[in-house]
């Protein structure tokens, strides 16, 4: 992937060698995308099929898929390059370093698609307070966070956290495809991975919410949540997007 012009590989060891920091931080609009369209991130993008799917569906927005495992994103990077998609890029790095790659207010939306719910490690949950404070450093005021998950545990946890902290909720459903309460553009993008769980009878949960006031201290919900069977499913296959 070193030859792909829209793929940036900056794990922590590489970033440390850059005395001036990541060159596109605060300059994604002017120096890479060459437009002022909203920037949308997909965290833990895997093979990149959802990032590419969003890029096709929303040409008026810029999309950046982020994952630490570079081999995963090769498929999405190749497809977007072959199709000449100028609104898609990929970044190989740790999500914990997000503010080293994006300036304050540079990001309009964040997608978190089917992450590990981290049932035993609160600090690693991508919708937990630790990460919300990180997103605060890059997300514009009024920006949105989107979570799609098949994990009842993570959905319940995120819903409780949002309610406890009084965060604005834009859309929420515990059965995304069964109740049809969200915009069709979101329903129209399914990864193979997502389709697989639907065929097994799992429901997809979705919540779109905003952040709190600047510099607010987020609180963790003090509730007991029953663990789910997230680990019992084969999650190794994440291939092409499947149209609905």
UniProtKB/Swiss-Prot annotation:
Pathway per the UniProt entry: tRNA modification; N(7)-methylguanine-tRNA biosynthesis
Keyword set, alphabetical order: Methyltransferase, S-adenosyl-L-methionine, Transferase, tRNA processing
EC class name: transferase
InterPro entries: SAM-dependent_MTases_sf, tRNA_(Gua-N-7)_MeTrfase_Trmb, tRNA_methyltr_TrmB_bact
Catalyzed reactions: guanosine(46) in tRNA + S-adenosyl-L-methionine = N(7)-methylguanosine(46) in tRNA + S-adenosyl-L-homocysteine
Disulfide-bond pairs as recorded: none
GO cellular component: tRNA methyltransferase complex
Pfam families listed in its UniProt record: Methyltransf_4
EC number(s) recorded for this UniProt protein: 2.1.1.33
Entry annotated with the keyword Transferase: yes
Protein family: Belongs to the class I-like SAM-binding methyltransferase superfamily. TrmB family.
Task performed by this protein: Catalyzes the formation of N(7)-methylguanine at position 46 (m7G46) in tRNA.
Listed name of the protein: tRNA (guanine-N(7)-)-methyltransferase
């Amino acid at each position: 992937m070193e030859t792909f012009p829209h793929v940036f590989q900056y794990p922590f060891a590489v970033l440390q060698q850059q005395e001036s920091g990541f060159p596109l931080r605060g300059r994604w609009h002017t120096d890479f995308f060459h437009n002022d369209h909203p920037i949308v991130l997909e965290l833990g993008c895997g093979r990149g099929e959802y990032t590419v799917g969003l890029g096709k569906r929303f040409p008026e927005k810029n999309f950046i898929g982020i994952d630490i495992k570079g081999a995963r994103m090769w498929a999405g990077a190749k497809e977007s390059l072959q199709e000449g998609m100028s609104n898609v890029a990929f970044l190989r790095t740790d999500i914990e370093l997000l503010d080293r790659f994006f300036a304050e207010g540079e990001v309009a939306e964040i997608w978190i698609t089917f992450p590990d719910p981290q049932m035993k490690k609160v600090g690693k949950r991508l919708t937990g307070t630790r990460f919300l404070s990180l997103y605060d450093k890059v997300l514009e005021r009024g920006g949105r966070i989107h979570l799609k998950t098949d994990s009842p545990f993570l959905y319940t946890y995120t819903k409780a956290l949002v309610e406890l902290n009084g965060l604005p909720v834009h859309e929420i459903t515990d059965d995304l495809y069964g109740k049809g309460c969200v915009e069709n553009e979101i329903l129209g993008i399914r990864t193979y991975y997502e389709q697989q769980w639907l065929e097994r009878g799992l429901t997809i949960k979705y919540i779109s919410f905003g952040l709190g006031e600047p510099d607010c201290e987020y609180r963790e919900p003090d509730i007991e949540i029953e663990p789910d069977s997230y680990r019992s499913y084969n999650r190794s296959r994440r291939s092409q997007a499947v149209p609905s």
